[in-house]
């Protein structure tokens, strides 16, 4: 089934210039709707870790993009306090108390998650934003004013602190999603974009900005990483001098590996999770 679905999406992608809300074959509409539905349930992901490597399902990302070609804007309401006009409905638009109980997560007003995003059990959405295609795994806290961009992959027991920005893939168009692996702590107002991978058990300090061109300097080894924070790293903002010493440029610095002291400062509060 998934192979047939993928084939339909790939064909529709090649013909995307000819697609619109008023001009699209029924099988294409059904295929795109199927993908969005599976993303919403967590049955399908834009990226998966297999044999220790992250594999991006580009065709799934294409289905997300195609959904914008196929849908018209429509009025939407939010709890009676305001109105919206958009192509993608809220994930929770038709949720009942039973649906929330089955989901096993908390959603604090006025948090927004778009349909096609997945929220795992014991996750907590403070007033935040989760975009279409994103995957937020079990036990993760998305704190106030944090943003989880389109198709971003957030692991288990992650803490995204207040105002954190996790970049998406839709605009500007990115090849790969941002991935935050299990048990990571992302400090307040930090930004992770352009498909950067933060590997498991890492701690990112406040105000760290990570993109593909950001130098990630390991002060113990002198090694410079791009696009990847090694597992168990503690990262803070810093600067590196130019070759001629006339100026310095921003970088991120790996100051040490996570230890017991770091964990004590960044541990999750189980009282905030669960039923």
Swiss-Prot record:
Q: Which domain of life is it from?
A: Bacteria
Q: Where does the UniProt entry say this protein principally localizes?
A: cytoplasm
One Gene Ontology CC term in the entry = cytoplasm
Annotated catalysed reactions = (S)-2,3,4,5-tetrahydrodipicolinate + succinyl-CoA + H2O = (S)-2-succinylamino-6-oxoheptanedioate + CoA
Name the GO terms of the biological process aspect.
diaminopimelate biosynthetic process; lysine biosynthetic process via diaminopimelate
Question: Which molecular function term from Gene Ontology is one that the record holds?
Answer: 2,3,4,5-tetrahydropyridine-2,6-dicarboxylate N-succinyltransferase activity
Q: What is its EC number?
A: 2.3.1.117
The metabolic or biological pathway listed in the UniProt record of this protein is: Amino-acid biosynthesis; L-lysine biosynthesis via DAP pathway; LL-2,6-diaminopimelate from (S)-tetrahydrodipicolinate (succinylase route): step 1/3
Q: Which UniProt keywords apply?
A: Acyltransferase, Amino-acid biosynthesis, Cytoplasm, Diaminopimelate biosynthesis, Lysine biosynthesis, Repeat, Transferase
Where along this sequence does the record place binding of substrate? 106, 143
Q: What family is this protein classified in?
A: Belongs to the transferase hexapeptide repeat family.
Show the PANTHER family listed in the entry: 2,3,4,5-TETRAHYDROPYRIDINE-2,6-DICARBOXYLATE N-SUCCINYLTRANSFERASE, MOLYBDENUM COFACTOR GUANYLYLTRANSFERASE
Q: How does it assemble?
A: Homotrimer.
Q: What is this protein called?
A: 2,3,4,5-tetrahydropyridine-2,6-dicarboxylate N-succinyltransferase
Supply the source organism for this entry.
Ralstonia nicotianae (strain ATCC BAA-1114 / GMI1000)
């Amino acid at each position: 089934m998934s192979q047939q679905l993928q084939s339909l999406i790939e064909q529709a992608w090649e013909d995307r210039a000819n697609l619109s809300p008023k001009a699209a074959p029924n099988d294409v509409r059904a295929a795109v709707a199927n993908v969005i539905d599976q993303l919403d349930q967590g049955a399908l992901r834009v990226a998966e870790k297999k044999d220790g490597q992250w594999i991006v399902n580009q065709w799934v990302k294409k289905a997300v993009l195609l959904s914008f070609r196929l849908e018209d804007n429509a009025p939407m309401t939010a709890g009676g306090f305001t109105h919206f006009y958009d192509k993608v409905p809220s994930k929770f638009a038709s949720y009942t108390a039973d649906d929330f109980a089955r989901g096993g997560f908390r959603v604090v007003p006025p948090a927004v998650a778009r349909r096609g995003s997945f929220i795992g059990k014991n996750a907590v959405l403070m007033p935040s934003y989760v975009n279409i295609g994103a995957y937020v795994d079990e036990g993760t806290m998305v704190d106030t004013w944090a943003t989880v961009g389109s198709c971003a992959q957030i692991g288990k027991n992650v803490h995204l602190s207040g105002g954190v920005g996790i970049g998406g893939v839709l605009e500007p168009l990115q090849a790969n999603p941002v991935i935050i692996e299990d048990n990571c702590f992302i400090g307040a107002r930090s930004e992770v974009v352009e498909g950067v991978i933060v590997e498991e058990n890492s701690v990112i300090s406040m105000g760290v900005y990570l993109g593909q061109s950001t130098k990630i300097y390991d002060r113990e080894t002198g090694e410079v990483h791009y696009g990847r924070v090694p597992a168990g790293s503690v990262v803070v903002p810093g600067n590196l001098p130019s070759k001629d010493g006339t100026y310095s440029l921003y970088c991120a610095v790996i100051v040490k590996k996570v230890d017991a002291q770091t964990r004590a400062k960044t541990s999750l509060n189980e009282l905030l999770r669960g039923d």
